[in-house]
Amino acid sequence: MKKKKKKGHLKLTFILFIAFLWIVAVFQIYSVINKHKKIDGGLSGDDENSTPSPLKRNTTEELFFINFMQDLYSEHYDIQNVYVYDYIPDDEDIEYDGSSKYYFVTIEKKLKYGSVFQLPFVIGMEQAVNKLNGIKEAKRIYNKRITELKKYIGLPQIENNIFKVVFSEENNFENAKVKIATYHSEISAMRLKPLSDSEMIKDGYGFIISYVSNMRDKIEYDNTAAVKYADKYTSNPLNKAKNENVWNQKYKKYENDCANFVSQCIYAGGIRPTKTWFPESFYWIRTGSPKYHDISGLTTYMQKKNIFSQTNYSGLSAGGFICLIKESHVVFVTSNDSITVLFNGHTNDRKRVSFPHLNESEAMYLTPNN
């Protein structure tokens, strides 16, 4: 009888052990799938149900971009992974002669700062708050920005970029120049390099001083809801300019859909339509860029109604938007740790792509007045 009990006990132990191994295996598979979802950056290829595979490890291209990203970001970030994809621009005017190649590059990085109060921008804000001692609104906006920035400390961030590599000799990466190829007007990729500490401190100081000097009525706006919408309804297509399958089918689509998309994001954040700003209206679908002084649109409307106001690069909150003046184009801000801004957009479709440091003659940085 004792032997039977012993055998039964051993059998039960064996079954439990096998079950445990299955559970461990399932969790490992899930973690791999989940990690892949996190790093794919919303990529979409010709097959909408598949994600393109990155180039093989230790290729010339990958090693080149690992070194390039280290040069750009190593002062402020730990670069944890770099994924390099071939990129095919959807532009009939581009001729391929071997003198240049295009790449889509996803990087996984993490801020080196252990505390939000170590960020140069925050140091600058604190200096301004101390100078404006007793002004409650200065302290309020300081605390709000601190709360926003805390979520970036210690957590990996995914950043996407589209680069054009220009070779001095065909396919020779030595001495090759890298340009940002996000849109038609290409600029040096070195403009992605973060500002110096002193410049970010100055931005932090100026952010508080400017806000207090131009205080506006506080609006109700859900930044998180707006960002979630922006992430849901765009992607990073590798073989075409846009993937309308992921767009919100409830809205009319436009050949130049950038302002339409940003307006949708702002609406998702809780800003209600009016008799002037509503789907398909002029103010909803036009950028309102200063490039066209006599034509109003989204940018002019949001400023006139004091819903958004101009700020600097580091002071821009996720949930804000950027107007590119020369291109008459708008994009929606989905992340800003005060060092690097990421944006989403339509025409062309972009998701979590880094924005270069453009000056006030090139871009307007608009943040919500909440």
PLM feature segments, named:
Residues 130-135, 142-157, 339-370:
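Glycine-rich, aromatic-bearing surface loops/beta-hairpins
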Residues 245-253, 276-282, 325-362:
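Glycine-rich catalytic cores of cysteine/serine-nucleophile enzymes that process amide/ester linkages
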Residues 97-121, 125:
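A short hydrophobic beta-strand element
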Residues 128-224:
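Non-catalytic propeptide/linker segments at domain boundaries
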Residues 42, 47-82, 224-231:
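Short, non-transmembrane alpha-helical segments in secretory-pathway proteins
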Residues 100-108, 282-346:
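...with weaker cross-activation on analogous glycine-rich loops/strands in unrelated enzymes
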Residues 2-19, 29-32:
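N-terminal Sec-pathway targeting helices
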Residues 208-285:
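N-terminal capping segments
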